[in-house]
Amino acid sequence: MALSHDIKAEVVQGYATHVGDTGSPEVQVALLTTRIEGLTDHFKVNKHDHHSRQGLLRMVGQRRKLLDYLKKRDVNRYRTLIERLGLRK
């Protein structure tokens, strides 16, 4: 499920580390989280959409890899991001 331009710009602006930042791990994880949340809502209605579920699992895996990278590089940025996104309990 693609994100609209407005939603994507809002997420990028909210998590960017500097002006014009679209590639930092924080921005990438935030965008993936937004897409994952959208697909999660989609699956509540469409339980048998297995093809989209494959894409969801790929996105979750990619997000996990980015979070692992960020945790290795800078634990403080990782913890801040996890807290802002509400990913861990």
Curated annotation (Swiss-Prot):
SMART domains: Ribosomal_S15
Pfam family, one: Ribosomal_S15
Keyword line: Ribonucleoprotein, Ribosomal protein, RNA-binding, rRNA-binding
An example Gene Ontology CC term for this record: cytosolic small ribosomal subunit
GO molecular-function terms, A-Z: rRNA binding; structural constituent of ribosome
Annotated InterPro entries: Ribosomal_uS15 (IPR000589), Ribosomal_uS15_bac-type (IPR005290), uS15_NS1_RNA-bd_sf (IPR009068)
GO BP terms in the entry: translation
Family in the record: Belongs to the universal ribosomal protein uS15 family.
Quaternary state and interactors: Part of the 30S ribosomal subunit. Forms a bridge to the 50S subunit in the 70S ribosome, contacting the 23S rRNA.
Protein name (database record): Small ribosomal subunit protein uS15
